[in-house]
Structures are given as structure tokens and as C-alpha cells.
Amino acid sequence: MKIVIAGAGDMGTHLSKMLSGNGHDLTVVDVDPKALVEVGNLVDVVTVEGDTTQFSVLRRAGVRKCDLFIAVRSVENDNILSAVMAKQLGAKKAIARVDSNEYLEPNSKEVFIDMGIDYLFYPEQIAAHEVINLLGHTSSTEYVDFAGGKLSMVAFRLELTSPLLGRTVIDADNEDEDLEYRVVAIVRGARTIIPTVEDRFEEDDMVYAISRHNATHKVVELSGRREVEIRNMMILGGSRIGVRIANELQNDVNIKLVDYDADKAFRLAERLDKTLIINEDGRDTEAMMEEDLAGMDAFVAVTGRSETNILAAMLAKRMGVKKVIAEVENINYISLAESIGVDTIINKKLVTASNIFRFTMTTEVQTIKCLTGSQAEVMEFIVKPNSPATKHKVCDLGLPEDSIIGGVVRGDRVFIAVEETQINAYDRVVVFAMPDSVMRVAEFFN
């Protein structure tokens, strides 16, 4: 697939790295020659210097023959205009990043579709929804629903009290008499393991399981932790993410929102009438003790500065907060944050990439999630008639070794996949796969 990316900033660079490993023909366009040199040193891409709001630059980038145009420049209006122009020049699909929720409302979306833009995405909104979802599943570090909620992916870290410690995967399978879940991956240190029946669980393992939706509570109990009802929460950072979280939850949860900027705190107090706004530095231990951080059920650090968020999250964990979530935009810091005990990491680039990645797939993908705690992806495919996946049982399909089928939904029936499972046309199939095998896996369902 020929893909043109407008913008060589953080988002554009991350997308370039993610998509380059899947055999795509990538071109990156930016007005900043230094940014182009940096992305060119990291990834095998064609770079074009120029402004994508100019037809001449779009033509030089080969937009007329591109399959997908992705506008991720820093200025919202530039993204919208670039996407419209690219579509008019012949791009098969054009998608754009925006910074306003207003553009995502149904009436507005129809206007943009008429203009030729296939999809608009607002990273801060996507990240806020991710946080809200995770606050409803406090024992999980990552949580995704598939097939309208019939199947779920649950990720959890094994505590010292976990009943799985020292046991093998087959031991866990034998106890799951009703076949309600399947372990699809174990992350140990920096290594992601697609487990065999003989693999043994160890303390601090990150376990990924596909589960029937009504059994997720049983699965997370295997972590050694219990779900916590969130009644009192503190948000650090009056960022777009922080404001969206507070706005959506303030009617149901007692929220304190902390921001060090006095002017911003004053404006937020006018906007969030049911949220207590506090003008303090979230890294100040004494100030946080006075604001009863230790009495919070959840702490969410979303200042936009990775270092600040990690330090504040460490403080919250030390004070005994049960659920701690931190926004970490520097991908190099994610493993550090996890190693010091931060429960869940949010990264706008990763959550947004999940929404964009499905546009690069030729197979019908209903849902795709780029995982934070692993380099892997988990996908929900809709099986086409006569596709290779329907020809054999799961054990004989010949899937890549670094992939595994977790579950199948057939109408109202839900199956946890085993070796003897037979996949039929129009089934919804949830697959866990490492990046290098994603495209090969997709071919089985096409």
C-alpha cells in the first residue's frame, strides 16, 4: 500500500515506524528539513520537504497514486485542508487529526465526509475514553471489548498473591472447566511470549487473556488483585485529556483536579462545576498529603509531561492509591514506568495508531488495538467466505508462530478457541499477533 503521511512530528514519526515494518511504500512530508532527516534516519521512507496545503507539494509526494493519506500536522486546519486537497487529487482514502470534539459530532462528520475526508481522529479524546474504560476495570492494566462486548481482552500483572504463580498454562487450562478464557501472551521483562502449555507463570509477569465477557471478573482474580469501586479520584493536569475525563465522570465520582497554573485552574473552575480544582504542584509531597492523595481510589496523571506524570504516579503508589494511571508520551519511558509499579500507561500515539492501523488492512478488521505493555496487536477479523481460515481446524491452519487465536463469536454464540475449533464464514475472530506477522495473519481471513 502506498501511504503519504503529512507531518514528521511525534505522531508522524511513530506512524512511520509502525507502518514501515508491514511492507508499505511510505512517503513523509514536512516543512521542517531537520524533522525529515530524523525520520529518514529511523525508517526507510521517502521524504518530501514542503507544505501539504500546496497542490505542488502534494503532487511531488505522489498523492495522486496513494492508497492512504494521513494528515498529522500540528495545526488542525492544515490537516483538514491537506486531507481535502489530497482526496481531490486522487488519494483513495484521506484521514486527518483534529483538536476539537465539535468536528466529531454526527452533523459535522457528515460535512467532512461530503468534503472527501474518510475519517477524523482526536487523540486526546481517544486517550480520555481509554482512561475512563480502564477506571471501570481497576485490576486490569489494559482492557478491550470485541464483538459488541461478547469477548474481552484483559491484561493483568501477577502479584505475589496470584494463584497462578509457579503453575503452567496447562494447569490453568485444566481448572477452566467451562472454557471461559485463554491466555494468549505473557510479557516477561522486555520479552513477549506466545505461551505453550508447558510455560510457567512467574511473579510480575504481565498476562494477556481473551475471555468471555461475563467471565472477566474471574480472570482478573487470577492476578491476585481485587476490583475497586472508584468513588474518589484525583486528576493531575488540566490538559485536554484531564478535562475530558473530569467532564465525563464528575457526576458519578468525587474528583479533584490539580494544576500548577493558577490562570488555567481559575478557568477550569468555571468550566467544571462539579469538580474541585486545586492550584498545586502534583510533585509536592506535602501538598498532595494535604489534599488527601492517600484517600483516593484512583490517581490519573495527564499533564502532558512524561517525567512529571511518572514522578507523580510514583508518589501516588507510595501513598497507597489503588489504581494509578499515567500518560507517558516518551515511548522509551514506558518500560521504566511499568517497572516502578505504575498500574497502567496511556500513550496517545499508541491509542491513536490503533484507530489508523485498520485503514492499512485489506482484510475486514472490526477492531484493532496496539498494546502498550507489549509490542503486539490484538485484532478482531470478520471472516470472508472461502478464506483460508475456514478450510481447517485451528490446529491445522498453519498460523505464524508469533500469533494465536483467542476467541470466536458466531452470532450469539461465543467460543474460546482451542485446537479443534472450526472457523466459519462471517465469524468474528480475535487474534493476538506480533507486528511482523500481522499482515500474514490477515491473509487467513481474506
Sequence positions of predicted segments:
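Cytosolic regulatory regions of ion transport systems
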Residues: 1-446
